[in-house]
């Protein structure tokens, strides 16, 4: 068996963010090869996410957020978001509550329209396709390129409109889907957004 050094353990933890026990096991099972251990941990993480996805998230909380453009003025925007987990114990943790606050603030800033892509009505997607196709023809794009251009535009619309596909406003390298997966791995439960509402507040 290969010697496992403290430097190897530290490097793998920095690369993956995995716990100490998982990192040690990954290195032992892969003869100290950091790259193989990294792949092993990645596959284990995918398996854990898939396992959690099959479970029911029946607990959680509803977080509210009021946005003010000026601390001295009344709020102009409100958000309600339902964040679900499997147990009441996790719902009461500070990490879960902070995640709900982060999501509410993200929704206020990013203005998503749907939680998941399958919630987008087909007629909405078709309307977007027609708009992009008409624009491409008006710009004189080659006929053979229009389909690819339109699909790229539609995919962009989905990514900007769907909460789970949006980049997190606090870290553009992480999507909201990845943020929830990371939280689920950390808390050991399935974490999901049930629904949300974003609304403007009119002053009398």
Swiss-Prot record:
Alphabetical list of SUPFAM superfamilies matching this protein: Elongation factor Ts (EF-Ts), dimerisation domain, UBA-like
Cellular location(s): Cytoplasm
Keywords: Cytoplasm, Elongation factor, Protein biosynthesis
Involved in Mg(2+) ion dislocation from EF-Tu: region residues: 87-90
Intrachain disulfide bonds: none
Highest rank taxon of the organism: Bacteria
Cytoplasm found in the keyword field: yes
PROSITE patterns per the UniProt record, alphabetical: EF_TS_1
Molecular-function GO terms, alphabetical: translation elongation factor activity
Coiled-coil annotated spans: none
Function: Associates with the EF-Tu.GDP complex and induces the exchange of GDP to GTP. It remains bound to the aminoacyl-tRNA.EF-Tu.GTP complex up to the GTP hydrolysis stage on the ribosome.
Family per record: Belongs to the EF-Ts family.
Protein name according to UniProt: Elongation factor Ts
Naturally occurring in which organism (per UniProt): Frankia alni (strain DSM 45986 / CECT 9034 / ACN14a)
Gene this chain is encoded by: tsf
